[in-house]
């Protein structure tokens, strides 16, 4: 696996910087970095931890990664930082308002999880990689210390699911009931809340779960939820992680807003 810890404001563009005069050729090598990341994609797990800013070139790294945790108030990513945005568009905006942790966790969906500090970020990366093989030709690791029996019967499921199909319920409660020890790694939980994508285990075996969430837009599919589910399924497919679908969906969203967003392509 490849893990980046990103804390970079990008290349210097002042007269002494890498992009000045004859020095611009020195920065051209960054294209090779992006090429290698593309080649590695789907072959080994790619993690980009945003522990600081990632502007310009360093913003492409998380854009190509599989898993992007961000440290709250520290991490950010944008193709152009606030000074460049001001120079080009005239807009005054802070680093966090432009591409901070809340923005990418809730609005854009580029970030997967917003965490409190770097220690929590590292622990989360370890948890993510515990589900992953070392590379695509290796089987996902199986935990042998699981004591949660796979054949257990849980009557609480009958209480979670309502009798009426028009009544919302907690899909997370169902997911946690059927997996080992109730532990899940929820990916992009604050973006496209109408669908849940998470990693978990059953009998020690890693699985990916895709579940419609009745508490988010009634579980209906829209552009963002389709993108979220598709990206997650591609990662699971690349690394041999079985998928479990919990389906309760009224269909695709309709209306001018989603048509203008290109829902037919999704």
Q: How would you name each of these model-derived features?
A:
Residues 24-27, 69-71, 161-169, 198-202:
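Short low-complexity stretches enriched in small and charged residues
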Residues 6-137, 241, 249-266:
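Conserved catalytic cores of soluble enzyme domains
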Residues 166-266:
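Non-catalytic terminal/interface segments that mediate subunit docking, oligomerization
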Residues 8-9, 141-153, 192-193, 246-253:
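A glycine-rich phosphate-binding loop feature that marks nucleotide/adenosyl-phosphate handling sites
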Residues 113-175:
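Terminal amphipathic helices with adjacent charged low-complexity linkers/tails
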Residues 86-93, 109-116, 160-169, 214-221:
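Short, exposed beta-strand "edge-strand" segments with a Pro/Gly-rich flavor and a Y/T-containing core
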